[in-house]
Amino acid sequence: NGASANAMLKIMEEPPEGVMFLLTASSAAAVLPTIRSRCAAYTMAPVPTEECAAALRTAQPELNEQNAQDLAFLYEGHIGLCLKALTDPAAKVARAAARELCRQAQQQDTYRVQALLAGYEKDKDSAAAVLWQATQAASAALRRPGFDGVQPDTAARILRAAEAARRAMKANGNLRLALTVCGMEMAAR
């Protein structure tokens, strides 16, 4: 609302002593011009996949080169996301479920896709994590056809279906319905 925006601008113009704001946005265009004019902009980008893979191998010496390259490609050079996928138990589970989901969607196995998603009907956070991982995998398959065994046509279906389900979940839609529709669209012939 307007009052909140004005209060934020006032604080940004005259911050309390010792206070520094760090604002992030995916695009400078997403920030209001009045706020942008009061900020110093720094553009940040992921590191190249080769550097990301090298950082992964340094952090996880037991990781083989191909897996490091694949993770770096999958997460587009985001070292933190790659390390999380390697070390966080919940992220590992979500990634494994997403890989299986993508495999079954590639085979157009509606039953197995639905069975996998049904396991998340009572756990919105885990469902969101699996769908996010599926969007990452689909995006990777669109950038490199055949990545993780997924072809571009299937990747496009997965991406559309997962994003629609994630939007429905954010809007507090019925989780069971969102996942059912998602599964039907992912495995469509």
Tell where the protein language model's regions lie, with residue ranges.
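Charged, glycine-rich active-site and insertion segments that engage polyanionic ligands
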Residues: E17-M20, A25-Q133, A137-R189
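Conserved catalytic/switch belt of AAA+ P-loop NTPases
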Residues: N6-M20
